[in-house]
Amino acid sequence: NGDGGEVTPSSQEIEQAVRLTQLPPLDAEDRALFVDRMLPADLAQEAYASGAYQPLRSWAHAAFAATVRSSSEAVEITLVADGLTKVLRFANDGTLAVSYRWEAAAVPHGVVFATEVSLSHPLELRTTPSAETWSFPIATVAKSERGLDQTVQGESVTLRWPAAAGGASIAVG
């Protein structure tokens, strides 16, 4: 002791003091750019952000057939899987455009098509048609000598369109 009466807590005392008031959000799927899902119409943003939901359909682990086309202006990668076509266009000027087509007739009324983008830095996303945007911080929780530390790693941005639209596009940058 000898330092003015302050007592350093024991490792057992620190361990007992480590408590979460709520569980951190669960990532049911890997974080990446353009993780595509069909979501229920009544899904609340809070449930989505916490990971406490089931997508109606997810292409996160789908095996896509890929076709690559190159021109003097851009490289286009067309991905097709299970009723979804996604085209990634990488232009020579460094811009990226992503376009989607899905089978709207096969989707129940009110369902939402969504794509999630996990970002470490802000990025401008322009959508056609205009998308509803949900965002929340991506954070990790780790135990340290101070207790539990929460570190923000980036931001999740989810772009949402009525599935009845049958398609959408995003310009990045």
Q: Model features per residue range: what roles?
A:
Residues N1, M38, D42-H109, F113, ...:
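Beta-strand-rich recognition/accessory modules
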Residues V112-H121:
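Short acidic, flexible loop segments centered on an aromatic residue
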Residues N1-S58:
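Glycine- and small hydrophobic-enriched segments that form the cores of compact globular domains
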